[in-house]
Amino acid sequence: MGIKKFFKIKPPKEDTVEQNRENLMDIGIATKSTTKKPQSKFAAYGQFAKDRATSKIYAPPGYEDFARPPEELEKKEGEEDDLNKSELDEKETKKDKKKKKKKHQQEDEPAAVQDPYARTEKSYRYNPDPYGAGAAGEKAFSSSGVYNEFNNYENGPSYGNEYGRRDRSEDLNAYNGTPGQPMKPVNRATPVLDRRDSAREDPAYGYNNQNRSNPYAGAGVGALAGGAAGGAVGAMGSVVSGSNPYGGASYGSGYGSSATTSAPVSKPISRTNTSASNPYGNASYGSTPGVNDRPAGSNPYAAISGDSYLNGTRSGNISRSGTNPYLRRNASNSVPPQAGYITPDSNNVALAEEENQQNQDELDLNDAPEDANEFVFEDKYMGRESKYAENSAALDELDLNATINDRGEDLNATGYGNMYEQQQQPQWQREEEEYGYGTQDDMNRGYKTFDEIQREEEERQKEEEDQAVDEIKEQIRFTKQSSVASTRNTLKMAQEAEMAGMNTLGMLGHQSEKLNNVERNLDLIKIQNTAADEKVAELKKLNRNILAVHVSNPFNSKRRRREREDMIKGRKMEDKMRAEHMSQELHQSTQRIEGALGGGNETSAVREKYQREKVLAAAKKYQFENDEEDDEMEVEIDRNLDKIQQISGRLKKLALATGEELDSQQRRIRDIEENTDEMDIKIHMNTTRLADIR
């Protein structure tokens, strides 16, 4: 049993970081301050370098994802980045989910509608699929089959397809229009449409079951009780079978005359169009209840007499019109009387007979347009055409041997001769008169003198010289514009190069600050490792055998104390000098970078003014008839060249500063490497010594 275990001696508790720092400061050992933050002048360039840094990976094709960090890989495998998504967005809570679930349940229940007039949630009137087959026993005029007890406006009739809502047990042959077999009526539970059902089922209202495939073909859609006129036309419309089942439908008013007989029509009523050409041509658009002054199938706008384009058609054969030749293109199509026709109203029959009497004149297609007087506008221009016809004789008597300028002369006209001679005068003669030579006598001579030829040659040479001068001017202007463009491009590239150099030097400044921080930390490690060496030696001395008594020499205690003080003083001075050296290196690096980044960019307004005057004075020897634009180009060329020269000087300074900074940082990095290796060895030795102590 050991002595420590016998006396139950426990090892002391380890000190915290703060306690250790305080203890080191009490014995005079330097520590790192946690409250003071180092001042950084080039932190922005550090962030700039961090943003532009790219991680380069090497991977075979198809295995790039395995080289990425796990966080990035999980993010990619998850949901894609949403630009509208924010970190402040909260997730949906359980309470919100319950509210949403309750809301959906209320929407699914028709009786849960709070507002009796609201149609926003579900529609009980209109079916999105009007031809979809409904359930058996469903209401005939309900698209959803649900009666809305809160909103009575929703319980009205629906205008869907009856074939989709029929009973499944009904006979399919009842809807196929089999001849000789009556149609099975549709059960309608809605009491509002009983009158319409009775009108459809009553044969007196024109409900014909033969050769029918649509129950709406013979019924009067606009009628509730069913008028006699609408029923008659509905009966006649049911005979004609066309491509549209609604061709025979009557849109007349249901309040027409009720006087009906069972006798057939003695005279067939002629109709304009059949259902094969126009499926809605047989529809009647009657308006006033109780008044039916037109037969069914007629045009409701035919009574407008003011419009010349509507006077041609009423019910049957279109008569010839003197104002509109396009109203005679329809052929007569009469319906033969058949048994079982409903006799229309007497007023309608009389009106139809009157219209047939007016349309007795058939159009002769062999008639000439002049005889028919079809186009009225031909009369308007007839007088003008006759006038041109009278003058056509003069064109036939045209003299083909006459010259172009040969025209009739009016000898009595004032100033005729001078004006005519002036018109006939050649261009070159008028130019000679303007220059002051070449009179009428000279022209009559037929030759030119030597002086005239010499003057013409001088004028020609002068024109050539002017053209050459203009060409030189244009060439000078073009060269100057090209020079301005070249200087602009050169200045732009020089500015880009300067910006790149400044960014590089700024990042080197940030790197210099980081190196200084590393050097300070290594210095603290070295100081504390020296104190650790002393503590390890003292611990080894105290942990020796209990029988080995260590007694110091009492005669040299003063000398040992003096040596220790000198050692502590020298160590402190060494640490201080090392810290000053590191600060000096950082200061030199900062001054070097700041001197290269700033300076030389200031421009004085006074200097710019005198520089402009100097440039314009020096450019006059090269300018010819200069204008304001020419002066501006000269000034811009000189300014750009001056800026390029300044940027070139700054680029040289940046290059030199960058080279010096790189050399300095390389030396510092080598020192850091050496100190790091040395400290690694010392720390390893202290660890080994502590392990040997038992």
From Swiss-Prot:
Q: Where is this region: Disordered?
A: 53-138, 151-221, 246-299
Keywords annotated in UniProt: Coiled coil, Protein transport, Repeat, Transport
Which SUPFAM superfamilies does the UniProt record give? Answer: SNARE fusion complex
In which domain of life is the source organism classified?
Eukaryota
Biased-composition ranges, Polar residues, are 269-290
Q: Where is the composition biased (Basic and acidic residues)?
A: 65-95, 193-203
Annotated GO biological processes are: exocytosis; protein transport; vesicle fusion
InterPro entries, sorted:
T_SNARE_dom
This entry carries the following GO cellular component terms, namely: fungal biofilm matrix; plasma membrane; SNARE complex
Indicate the segments forming the t-SNARE coiled-coil homology domain, all copies: 477-539, 631-693
A GO molecular function assigned to this protein is: syntaxin binding
| Alphabetized CDD domains for the sequence | SNARE_SEC9C, SNARE_SEC9N
Q: Which family does it belong to?
A: Belongs to the SNAP-25 family.
Identify this protein by name: Protein transport protein SEC9
Species in which this protein is naturally found: Candida glabrata (strain ATCC 2001 / BCRC 20586 / JCM 3761 / NBRC 0622 / NRRL Y-65 / CBS 138) (Yeast)
Q: Which gene encodes it?
A: SEC9
